[in-house]
Amino acid sequence: LGSTLAEIWSREAWGKWSYVDDDLLKPHNVVRHIGKDCHIGKSKVDVVKELVDLNYHSGEKSIAIHAKINDSENPQVKEAIDNAELLVDVTTSIETARDLPTLANLTRIVSTFITPSGEDAVLLFEDKYQKIRVDALETQYYRAILNNDWGVKHLKKHLGAFKTGGGCRDISMVISDELIKL
C-alpha cells in the first residue's frame, strides 16, 4: 500500500516525500509493491525513490532512508520527522503505530491501512491541532468495529489467531491489485 500511495502522489506531483523503511524487497512483495522482479533484494525505500523520481524529470526528488521510522537514535530519521508537515504511517507494525505519537510530537500523523479482504480501507487522520492523536483514533476505530453492525463484515477474511509472523509477514491473502489501487 505504501509504495502504491507513493506512486499515486508522485504522479499527482503532491508533496515532497521522505520514505523511511528498513525492509528489503522480497519475491512475495512484487505482487503488490511498485518494485519489479529486478529490484528483489534491494531496499524498498531505494526502489520507491528510484521509481517515483522517474515520474517527472523536473519534479521534487524524494529522500530514501533505509531505517526503522521509530529509530529515534538515527539522525536521518529524526531530521525527516522533525521537518515533516505530515507523517503518513503505512506500516503494518503495531510497535511503530504506538511509537510515532511520541516521536513525532509536533508532526501531524495519518495512519492508513486496508482490511484483510482488501475491500475496506481505513484512514486515521489527526486533526489540525492534534487534539486527538493517532493512537487514540485507533482505539476509537476498534471500538467502532465492536459497536457497529458494519464491524461484523469489516474484518471478513481475517484468519483469527492463526498467524505465521507479524504485520505484512502474516499469511498472505489473494487480493486484486485494483483493490489496492482504489
Range-by-range predicted roles:
Residues 53-76:
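S-adenosyl-L-methionine
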Residues 2-3, 25-28, 69-73, 95-97, ...:
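Flexible loop/turn segments at secondary-structure boundaries
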Residues 4, 68, 72-85:
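C-terminal structured domains
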Residues 1, 20-21, 67, 88-92, ...:
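Short His-Asn-centered micro-motif
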Residues 22-60:
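Glycine-rich phosphate-binding loop and adjoining beta1-alpha1-beta2 segment
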Residues 19, 27-30, 41, 97-100, ...:
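Extended hydrophobic-aromatic, low-complexity segments
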Residues 82-86, 90-182:
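Glycine-rich phosphate/adenylate-binding loop
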Residues 1-24:
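Glycine-rich adenosine-cofactor-binding loop
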